[in-house]
Amino acid sequence: MKVVFAGTPGFARVALQRLLDAGFSLPLVLTRPDQPAGRGLQWQASPVKQCALAHGLAVAQPRSLRLDGRYPQDAAAARAALLAAQAEVMVVAAYGLILPQWVLDLPARGCLNIHASLLPRWRGAAPIQRAIEAGDTHTGVTIMQMDAGLDTGAMLLSQGSAIAPTDTTATLHDRLAALGADLIVQALEKMAAGADLPALAQPAQGVAYARKIEKSESSIDWSLPAQRIGQRIRAFDPAPGASTTCNGTSIKLWGYAIDGATIDGQRGVPRMHPGQILSADDSGIAVACGQGTALRLTVLQRAGGKRLAAADFLRGFALQPGMWLGAARA
């Protein structure tokens, strides 16, 4: 079976490698154009392109697939390459470009998407991050027959995965990438064997949208309960990274523990307001949060520095009870 693959980041690279290992013919790989990255802003190929070139696969990098859009020449060249590939099916994983109807209609067996959630929950661009941010304890991967909607197509295969209390986007991403790679191989092998692969319409209930993560969301609002702040710290790891400030210095937050005692329940400790430091020692920096809760920061990072355990961080940045994190207070 000939398969065209469309994807860009590391999540997609895992699936591409798994398809290669399974012996599928891949006459063409689509990925986003190279982007400047790193401190030197050097042009860098996507993880999918790097994998494809390492295996001698043909790669196309259109800026758009819209024949009537801003880059019609790119779209026309991609269309010619897709027609020449004569693939029976296209596999899509975190590609990053909208597929117009002509692309969806081109392969005889359509386009299959590897989506990192149990649809219809968390349709959209950031399903892993939003699941952690929302405090979900369970997620998974869905193989979906793509249609013109935003992750609205019929479901072919799905499998769940627990979200651990310590999971970050980085750790959950890697588990779901491996799970998605296994599921897409299962789906394609069933197709190739002529086996029945029932397409189930997504239910109307339980729909949630995982909007793209904006950098502006990274700033912590200390008026939120500690549990919700912790979920954001894990959801925004590795990017964009949850952050706060202290006396004008930006600090990223990577590790935490929920303090069991409430702020007002600590004997001998005066009432503190959200964002005020309760204590700072080798065990962490305890910060007052909303609803009388407290969060102990255990791994922090100054701009341009490394991630440090609280004890090491405090040796280079003096934090004391009563100081404020976040917006300055009068």
Curated annotation (Swiss-Prot):
What Gene3D superfamilies does this protein's entry cite? Answer: Formyl transferase, C-terminal domain (3.10.25.10), Formyl transferase, N-terminal domain (3.40.50.170)
Q: Which SUPFAM superfamilies match?
A: FMT C-terminal domain-like, Formyltransferase
Residues holding (6S)-5,6,7,8-tetrahydrofolate = 117-120
Give the EC number(s) listed in the UniProt record. Answer: 2.1.2.9
> Which keywords are on file for this protein?
Protein biosynthesis, Transferase
Q: Tell me a Gene Ontology molecular-function term this record carries.
A: methionyl-tRNA formyltransferase activity
Q: Which reaction does it catalyse?
A: L-methionyl-tRNA(fMet) + (6R)-10-formyltetrahydrofolate = N-formyl-L-methionyl-tRNA(fMet) + (6S)-5,6,7,8-tetrahydrofolate + H(+)
Q: CDD domains, per this entry? A: FMT_core_Met-tRNA-FMT_N (cd08646), Met_tRNA_FMT_C (cd08704)
Q: Which domain of life is it from?
A: Bacteria
A Pfam cross-reference name: Formyl_trans_N
Q: What class of enzyme is it?
A: transferase
Q: Which GO terms describe its cellular component?
A: cytosol
Query: What family does the database annotate?
Result: Belongs to the Fmt family.
Q: What does this protein do?
A: Attaches a formyl group to the free amino group of methionyl-tRNA(fMet). The formyl group appears to play a dual role in the initiator identity of N-formylmethionyl-tRNA by promoting its recognition by IF2 and preventing the misappropriation of this tRNA by the elongation apparatus.
Q: What PANTHER family does the entry give?
A: METHIONYL-TRNA FORMYLTRANSFERASE, METHIONYL-TRNA FORMYLTRANSFERASE, MITOCHONDRIAL
Q: Name the chain's protein.
A: Methionyl-tRNA formyltransferase
Organism this protein belongs to: Verminephrobacter eiseniae (strain EF01-2)
**Gene from which the chain derives:** fmt
